[in-house]
């Protein structure tokens, strides 16, 4: 059976990130969260989120009883780069993949729940806010209280905070 690994939240201004693993044939799943603090200050600069993501996938591998003969389709995103490298080095059948369908939808749903648990809003409010520009406007309406939800480690955050327009694709660089 195939196991898929996907993330959600890596490119979002607000919140941490969610990592999901799902065995396609049985729909067994494992979900882990990378807290927003991993994307702030020195933790972001040292890329503390990468080993955290690897720990989540290791825990998920145990929970799902992952075997080395199962193909592991891992999303192409940077946040999963250490996972791809480590699993491949350990002899797992890692396949770089664009994850779509049920696993991607699960990742998105879990990320929305993550933001709601953080206090960003109800699930419905978060769904309406979802998107770079909407999140930025929401944060800037009360930046003193809401900056704690932001990936402040992004180089662009100081400029975004004062209202400078930046291409969302370049904001986390």
Give, region by region, the residue ranges found by the protein language model.
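RNase H-like, Mg2+-dependent phosphodiesterase core
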Residues: 1-173
